[in-house]
Amino acid sequence: APGEWYFNASEKTLYFFPPLGLNLATAKIEISALKHLIECKGQEDEPLKNVSFKGIHFVNAERTFMEKYEPLLRSDWCIYRGAAVVLENTENCTLADCTFSNLGGNAVFISRYNLSTTIRGCHFYDIGASAIALVGDTSAVRSVPNRYEKVTLPDQMDYVPGPNNHLYPRQCLIEDNLIHHIGRVEKQVAGVQIQVAAQITVRHNSIYQVPRAAINVGDGAFGGHLIEYNDAFETVLETSDHGAFNSWGRDRY
């Protein structure tokens, strides 16, 4: 079909079926060379603060399918901890009025400790995996229930209340974004994925044409999220046993 391609490694030849109207004699050919375009990383005891990106177009990052994935908590999710833009150990960082397109993996990954991250007014489309992932470290959860079949007996359970450490996003705002045509390569994805996080606000976003959930809350750690006034439609197009808004069970019970 038009737009499809095949690389014959033994012949070192790329075969491409051009779309109608494309002149190969004058076409521009671009090849991805990076999985992560920008990484903003501080230290847990010395976070990176007050960095803002505004009006930037992030495009053409490599695919990350079949890279090293890590299992998360109670759900069956595994995830690649990376994206075109990665924020880790940050405070008060902002992505505003940016465009993310033609990316092979996740677009934005808010990883481990992040306080007061804002993603506002951005456009995400033709994304290989998830648009926005807010994912803490499972070490922040006591008595980690990371598989269905793994059972923690009462005498082995950590009964201390609260997180085990600070390696998780909290008090972040995802607002007024347009997200569509994601999961072009991977299918266990979401427009907004929340896992091992606290007090995440997701509001006034439009999310459609996704293979799985528009918004997915992967576990019950640590709650306090506010999800309101989002427009989600044309979801769960390529998978099943899911929903436009999907959430999994509590982890501390």
Report each predicted region and the residues it spans.
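Right-handed parallel beta-helix
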Residues: 49-60, 91-105, 114-129, 138-160, ...
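Active-site lining segments that contact anionic ligands and/or coordinate catalytic metals
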Residues: 2, 11, 189, 212, ...
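Glycine-rich beta-solenoid repeat tracts in large extracellular/virion proteins
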Residues: 36-45, 65-66, 83-89, 106-113, ...
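Extracellular polysaccharide-degrading/modifying enzymes targeting complex plant/algal/animal polysaccharides
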Residues: 1-101, 140-164
